């Protein structure tokens, strides 16, 4: 067990060192959701959005939950990129030939992506606070937001790793990534509530796990525990099922890739 933990720690630090060498990429990844979605998009539609429709004090307050989950989405779907590059340059094959627990490779990636995403979410909530958005559920609510984000992120990272192990080139990977990310964002309650969507889009959005994550986080920010506790148990159950299915698919893809 001690050896297993050391393997996970060493591989996780490898991802950290790689990220620290890519300072521009790290900075862009951090500021992109805040700058584009929260600040530009939020302020652009601040006066256009009807507070009666979004049921929030202002549009930035409404949008914050969406930006949090969009950050989880983008990081999760990109979580397999480094594994794909390791596969393409032969490092993954060499790593698998060593006496290392194979699951430590996967777990280290989950740990890295989850940690980076959680830090980003905290920064986003901090910036939102500067715009007057204060989570109605306090610090405990922030912890629950991180938990929901982590649960959603695990499934997304599993999908990303399954793609990384299955596709033949990074070109195919990024094509699928682009195809998945934008529809998931626009067919969710990230930017507008379900009640304001066309009927067909609202029906599709209900099937989107991103919508469930957003609708669990939004009351934690806007209204407080009374409203937040209602969907929380259902969302946790949905996320557990979502994660289980995604992890099963990722495990099968991993076994095929190294088999």
Task: Explain the meaning of each model-derived region.
Residues 19, 75-100:
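Transmembrane helix boundary and interhelical loop/hinge segments in multi-pass membrane proteins
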Residues 252-259:
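Short cytosolic juxtamembrane segments of multi-pass membrane proteins
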């Amino acid at each position: 067990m001690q050896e297993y933990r050391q393997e996970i720690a060493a591989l996780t630090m490898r991802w950290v060192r790689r990220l620290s060498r890519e300072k521009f990429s790290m900075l862009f990844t951090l500021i992109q959701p805040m700058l584009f979605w929260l600040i530009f998009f939020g302020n652009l539609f601040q006066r256009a959005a009807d507070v009666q429709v979004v049921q929030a004090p202002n549009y930035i307050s409404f949008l914050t939950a969406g930006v949090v989950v969009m950050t989880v989405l983008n990081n999760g779907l990109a979580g397999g990129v480094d594994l794909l590059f390791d596969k393409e340059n032969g490092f993954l094959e060499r790593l698998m030939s060593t006496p290392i627990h194979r699951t430590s490779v996967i777990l280290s990636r989950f740990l890295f992506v989850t940690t980076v995403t959680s830090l980003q979410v905290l920064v986003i909530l901090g910036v939102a606070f500067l715009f007057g958005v204060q989570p109605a559920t306090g610090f405990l609510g922030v912890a629950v937001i991180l938990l929901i984000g982590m649960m959603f992120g695990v499934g997304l990272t599993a999908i990303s790793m399954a793609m990384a192990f299955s596709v033949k080139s990074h070109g195919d990977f990024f094509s699928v990534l682009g195809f998945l990310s934008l529809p998931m964002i626009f067919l969710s309650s990230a930017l507008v509530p379900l009640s304001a969507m066309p009927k067909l889009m609202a029906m599709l959005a209900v099937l989107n796990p991103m919508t469930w994550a957003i609708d669990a986080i939004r009351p934690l920010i806007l209204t407080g525990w009374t409203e937040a506790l209602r969907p929380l148990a259902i969302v946790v159950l949905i996320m557990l099922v979502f994660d289980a299915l995604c992890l099963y698919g990722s495990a099968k893809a991993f076994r095929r890739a190294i088999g």
